[in-house]
């Protein structure tokens, strides 16, 4: 036999069961992942096997311990990476900020009163409020899916920040070693032209050279010395940039950046196949997750077009105590559904829905554009890397030939079979050829960096990639 309280509570319980059943019937709009028509291989490159490059430490291909140490330090202390990680924390907090379907609102209160000449009384109350908003259109779940996607966007942005940092740091390091190589070439040029000046002075003293020859030799030496300050300034500038990328003030970096050789890639980049960039490039994952989030937010808008049903109530326990023996205790409760109708006209809300659908289509177009741009960047990087390798090889041969020509010219000058002007020109040709070789070696190294960055290689190296995100409860 039902008690009077249960008899009164039964309609409420039945309503709760019905509401839960209706809420469970809500269906999400199915998500169709965007697709792109990739070729089987990059142009001018043999078809390979799919490869995951997220943890590839491609910079170790330079076999440069100093660069390896700089990368390890930058992964720990780079300020841009720290800011990107905080954006992940913010996105996770935004997910937790989405209100759930059920909320409890407890409260406690104590009130003491005393009338004129009366007995003091203390009234104590404890109330628990309950609110349950029915979500038959899955708006909250859609908000949760969108928030989860925003977390994944923030995570991919952290990967992109790491990739950019690796690119900037490696490029700055290559430029540093290039500037140091240029400085070495300038000092070698000064030594060579000083020797030529001494030879010219000796020949002038023997009346075998003219005053014009002597002036030309002095001018060439002065010209070489004038190029040194600019080269030295370039070295310092790159050292300061590297320190900044490591989050250290200039002059406080404890990793030596003194004179060192120009690093050259000791291995080829693992290119894989074009379809690999969908998972290897953070910017493509960002665009895809933004598209997903915009699609999920479409499911939020329809809820504003229809009535909203909610169940709310409260249970209050009260106690009144006075100086007299005994007291009063009691309980009261109130429960009931409420229906909120949308305001009319509904044109603004339907317009908001149409605008959200348009944003989703825009996001899809942006994804396609990002993929197309990424494929083009990889194709260009492959071509530039191959061209730089060929140019560097040819430049090495050029330097060797000019060195042989300069040595022969010096011998001919001593035998009066060539002029001092010929020797000065030969030495200048060596300097220009060595500068060209250094530039080509720099381009080869930068091409290796650019190719790996274009492939998305190493974006999660040194840390766990991706995050498991718990779905929002309904």
Describe the role of every protein-language-model region.
Residues 27, 57, 63-66, 70, ...:
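Small/polar-residue-enriched beta-strand and adjacent coil segments characteristic
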Residues 72-95:
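Mid-chain, structured segments of secreted extracytoplasmic proteins
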Residues 419-431, 462-468:
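Short histidine
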Residues 88-90, 95-97, 112, 144-146, ...:
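Heptad-repeat amphipathic alpha-helical coiled-coil interaction surface used
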Residues 77, 84, 133, 140, ...:
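Amphipathic alpha-helical coiled-coil segments and their boundaries
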Residues 2-76, 148, 232-279, 321, ...:
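Terminal intrinsically disordered/low-complexity segments used for targeting and assembly
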Residues 204-208, 413-417, 454-458:
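A short glycine-centered flexible hinge/capping loop motif at secondary-structure junctions
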Residues 3, 140, 156-273, 384, ...:
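Periplasmic alpha-helical coiled-coil/stalk elements that build and connect Gram-negative outer-membrane
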């Amino acid at each position: 036999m039902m008690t009077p309280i249960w008899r009164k509570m039964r309609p409420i319980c039945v309503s709760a069961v019905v509401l839960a059943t209706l809420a469970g019937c809500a269906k999400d709009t199915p998500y169709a992942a965007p697709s792109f028509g990739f070729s089987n291989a990059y142009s001018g490159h043999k078809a390979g096997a799919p490869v995951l490059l997220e943890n590839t430490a491609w910079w170790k291909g330079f076999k440069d311990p100093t660069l390896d140490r700089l990368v390890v330090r930058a992964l720990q202390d780079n300020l841009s990476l720290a800011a990107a990680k905080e954006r992940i924390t913010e996105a996770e907090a935004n997910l937790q900020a989405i209100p759930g379907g059920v909320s409890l609102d407890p409260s406690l209160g104590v009130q003491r009163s005393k009338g004129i000449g009366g007995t003091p009384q203390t009234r104590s109350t404890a109330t628990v409020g309950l609110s349950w908003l029915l979500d038959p259109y899955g708006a909250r779940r859609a908000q949760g899916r969108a928030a989860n996607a925003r977390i994944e966007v923030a995570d991919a942005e952290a990967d992109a920040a790491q990739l950019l940092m690796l690119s900037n740091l490696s490029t700055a390091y290559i430029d540093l070693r290039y500037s140091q190589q240029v400085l070495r070439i300038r000092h070698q040029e000064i030594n060579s032209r000083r020797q030529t000046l001494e030879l010219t002075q000796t020949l002038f003293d023997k009346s075998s050279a003219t005053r014009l020859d002597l002036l030309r030799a002095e001018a060439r030496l002065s010209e070489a010395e004038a190029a040194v300050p600019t080269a030295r300034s370039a070295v310092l500038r790159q050292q300061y940039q590297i320190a900044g990328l490591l989050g250290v003030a200039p002059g406080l970096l404890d990793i030596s950046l003194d004179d060192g050789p120009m690093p050259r890639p000791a291995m080829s980049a693992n290119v894989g196949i074009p379809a690999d960039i969908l998972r290897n490039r953070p910017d493509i994952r960002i665009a895809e997750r933004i598209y997903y989030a915009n699609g999920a937010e479409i499911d939020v808008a329809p809820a504003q077009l229809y009535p909203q049903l909610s169940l709310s109530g409260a249970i209050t326990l009260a106690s009144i105590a006075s100086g007299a023996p005994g007291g009063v205790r009691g309980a009261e409760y109130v429960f009931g559904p409420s229906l909120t109708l949308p305001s009319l006209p509904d044109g603004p809300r339907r317009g908001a829905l149409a605008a959200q659908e348009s944003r989703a289509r825009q996001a899809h177009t942006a994804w396609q554009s990002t993929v197309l741009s990424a494929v083009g960047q990889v194709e260009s990087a492959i071509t530039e890397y191959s061209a730089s390798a060929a140019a560097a090889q040819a430049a090495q041969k050029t330097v060797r030939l000019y060195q042989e020509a300069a040595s022969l010219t010096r011998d001919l000058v001593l035998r009066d079979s060539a002029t001092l002007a010929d020797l000065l020109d030969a030495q200048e040709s060596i300097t220009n050829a060595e500068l060209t070789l250094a530039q080509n070696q720099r381009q080869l190294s930068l091409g290796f960096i650019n190719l790996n960055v274009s492939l998305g290689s190493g974006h999660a190296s040194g840390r766990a990639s991706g995050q498991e995100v718990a779905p929002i409860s309904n």
